[in-house]
Amino acid sequence: MALLNLFFCLVFSSPLMAMPPVLQGRKSMSPDSILKDTSTDDGARDFQGRKFPQFMMQLYQNIIRGRDKDLSNLEHPTLQESDTVQSFITKSYTTVGNHWTLFFDMSSISRSNELKLAELRFSLPSFRKSHSVTVDIYHTNDGKEKLFMGSFKTKPSAALDADCKVFNLTILLQNFLTRGKRLIKDEYIQAKGLHLKDLEKSATEKGTENVDTLKQDQYHVSDFAAERIMLVVFAKEQSHAKSDPPSLGKKLFPSKYGIDDNANKVNGFRRLRRNKKEKTQIHVSTGPPKPIEEIKPKCKKVDMFVDFQKIGWGSWIVYPKAYNAYRCESTCAVPLNETENATNHSYIKSLLPLSDMERKECPSCVPVKMMSMSMLYYENEDFILRHHEEMIVEECGFKDM
């Protein structure tokens, strides 16, 4: 996959066009201010004592700004279909000559999601200068078990002169997650002098050996900037998995916002009660006719600001720290008028006299159109950028109770 690697490492354009730039607002809450306030000496970003890759913050910035012009014809439609971006920082890595072995904990990858794209991102100078490299990928859980997932060979020094090398591991990861098979593949550049059968034989040996017994120089993640070796996974929640609550729903207890009962009580039509004298009297008005009072919609959208820090979720939500979710509010007038967003049934019911109904109900003023929002947060020791549906009220209208 042809990429402008330097561009992707420094200014990643918006891949998820379904994510609208809905976070408006305060200068103190801008993504730029977060990057500035949380910078550390090694280039990583600090959040609640945890380091997270600058790439994820830059990706989030570009998503909410709607930048997508520089995406290639291949990445644009693929990334547009994703609703989750998950980053995995390497737990450790080993090198023996030009043979690199990387260890990731990918326990949090859900098999119920459809994998769209998996990128391995390198920004180590020693890797960029290598002429011919074989890279092995392992899954490890707390360092106790090491499971070989696949391998690829490449020639970093022959690629574009970029500070960050990006490799497409989509097939490798898909093959392992869906079939449990290891994959040895040339993703980008053929390395001269290496044969596929030799790699397959080596991979078979790797699947059964204990990597710790090899005489290798092992470096841990604490010895270098967190984002220098990272696996980024783009995924889409499948339709059959929609019945399960999303990750945000599993973490949060949804708040219920009710409408004031006093505002919803209906007294019915005002009926003019005239006595016998009033029926026989004729009133003549000499003044100008009174203008008909404009009937305004009774169901409207009002502000509802959510501060994640105040409700106890600030410890794991990186951005946004706060946003306007809006809510619907009404005074429930009958009969309904044509300016109010209601069903035909609501219109008819509002016109019936009180005597014809056992109970006069007020149509509920509820959201009829919702907007999505992108969120960057910490989950299962990984940083995730996820697109959550129905987070912001866009339009309100009447519906039957």
Curated annotation (Swiss-Prot):
Protein task: Exhibits mesoderm-dorsalizing activity and neural-inducing activity, but lacks mesoderm-inducing activity. Regulates the expression of specific mesodermal and neural genes. Induces convergent extension movements at the embryonic midline by activating the fgf signaling pathway to induce t/bra expression in the organizer region. Acts with wnt11 to induce Spemann organizer cells and induce axis formation. The unprocessed protein antagonizes bmp-signaling.
Disulfide bridge positions per record: 299-365, 328-396
Residues of the signal peptide: 1-18
UniProt keyword annotations, A-Z: Cleavage on pair of basic residues, Developmental protein, Disulfide bond, Gastrulation, Glycoprotein, Growth factor, Secreted, Signal
Stated family: Belongs to the TGF-beta family.
GO MF, one annotated term: cytokine activity
GO biological process: gastrulation
Main location: secreted
Official protein name in the record: Nodal homolog 3-B
PROSITE patterns registered for this protein in UniProt: TGF_BETA_2
Propeptide residue range(s): 19-274
Domain notes: The propeptide region is both necessary and sufficient for bmp-inhibitory activity. The propeptide region and the N- and C-terminal thirds of the mature protein are necessary for neural induction activity. Although cleavage doesn't appear essential for activity, residues surrounding the cleavage site are necessary for activity.
GO cellular component, one term: extracellular space
Tissue: Expressed in the dorsal marginal region of late blastula, becoming restricted to the dorsal blastopore lip (Spemann organizer) at the early gastrula stage.
Highest rank taxon of the organism: Eukaryota
Complexes and interactors: Monomer. The propeptide region interacts with bmp4 in a non-covalent manner.
Subcellular location: Secreted
Glycan-linked positions: 168, 337, 341, 344
UniProt-listed InterPro entries: Cystine-knot_cytokine, TGF-b_C, TGF-b_propeptide, TGF-beta-rel
